[in-house]
């Protein structure tokens, strides 16, 4: 009997020792919750509608430097959406902003600078989350072919007899003034856009300056020989490359990034069909076919 008890105790002891020696099975762990950044897919580029849209007229405001490209883009859009009429208004971004503020009907606003679109957003004109920074550009200094100018680049602008220059409310004019600040020709005591034409003339030794209301007028003034040199976007310069020489293209470290944002604008008079067509047109502007047109006109994608 004692032997049986001893044997049972020995077996029990061995079982207890085995339990203590064996490692505890790991508890099942829950997969870590994925972070929002990891699970949230990047916003997809919207696709334009394939089916024909209802008849509508979209009011499009575009920076003057975009006009050439849009003369190709709008007919291309109408190949797939013949019921939609795109009516465009091309001028300086500053003028277009003022028109929106004054109550002009606008559905889509395509600026040559961020500041105008930021103002639309701050003042409640822009539809939330509709802004797309679609294009880039650079500032160029041009002269008529055979002009014989002594100017070789921005650094010796003072050698010009006359300069065509957009005013400070025009993005190209503001970028030019920013460049002159960076080069030490303007003193930098105020914002670039606030330097008047007279300020710029005085800083350049009294050179005659033809103040232009948009960049297209600068381009035409140089192309026609009315002014010796002028500052325009590279895309503008390239569009008249047979008539002008490009003296210099400025690095964006001198001008700041030149971005072209497009956005939707609150239009209280717009019908549902008009709003749908405006949204669709912005989606169309982001397609490869349209990007190819912008690249053809030397915009930066």
For each of these PLM feature ranges, what is it?
Residues 1-9:
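Positively charged n-region of N-terminal signal peptides that target proteins for export
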Residues 4, 21, 28, 33-34, ...:
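Exported/periplasmic ABC-transporter solute-binding proteins
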Residues 15-19:
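C-terminal motif of bacterial Sec signal peptides marking the signal peptidase cleavage site
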Residues 97:
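Short acidic/polar micro-motifs at solvent-exposed secondary-structure junctions
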Residues 103, 107-113, 117-123, 127-133:
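Short beta-strand-centered segments that line the small-molecule binding cleft or hinge
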């Amino acid at each position: 009997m004692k032997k049986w008890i001893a044997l049972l105790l020995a077996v029990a002891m061995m079982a207890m020792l085995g339990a203590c020696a064996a490692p505890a099975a790991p508890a099942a762990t829950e997969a870590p919750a994925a972070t929002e950044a990891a699970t949230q897919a990047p916003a997809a580029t919207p696709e334009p509608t394939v089916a024909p849209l209802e008849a509508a007229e979209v009011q499009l405001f575009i920076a003057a430097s975009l006009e050439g490209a849009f003369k190709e883009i709008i007919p291309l859009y109408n190949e797939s959406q013949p019921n939609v009429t795109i009516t465009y208004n091309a001028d300086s971004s500053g003028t277009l902003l003022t028109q929106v503020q004054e109550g002009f009907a606008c559905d889509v606003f395509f600026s040559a600078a961020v500041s105008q679109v930021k103002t639309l957003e701050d003042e409640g004109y822009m539809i939330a989350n509709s802004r797309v920074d679609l294009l880039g550009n650079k500032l160029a200094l041009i002269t008529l072919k055979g002009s014989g100018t002594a100017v070789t680049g921005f650094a010796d602008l003072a050698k010009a007899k006359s300069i065509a220059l957009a005013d400070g409310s025009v993005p190209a004019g503001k970028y030019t003034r920013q460049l002159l600040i960076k080069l030490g020709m303007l003193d930098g005591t105020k914002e670039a856009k606030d330097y008047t034409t007279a300020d710029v003339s005085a800083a350049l030794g009294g050179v005659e300056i033809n103040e232009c209301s948009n960049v297209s007028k600068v381009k035409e003034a140089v192309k026609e020989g009315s002014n010796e040199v002028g500052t325009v976007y590279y895309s503008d310069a390239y569009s008249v490359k047979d008539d002008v020489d490009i003296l210099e293209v400025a690095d964006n470290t001198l001008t700041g990034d030149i971005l072209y944002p497009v956005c939707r604008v609150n239009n209280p008079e717009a019908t549902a069909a008009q709003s749908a067509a405006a949204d669709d047109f912005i989606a169309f502007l982001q397609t490869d076919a349209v990007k190819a047109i912008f690249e053809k006109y030397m915009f930066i994608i």
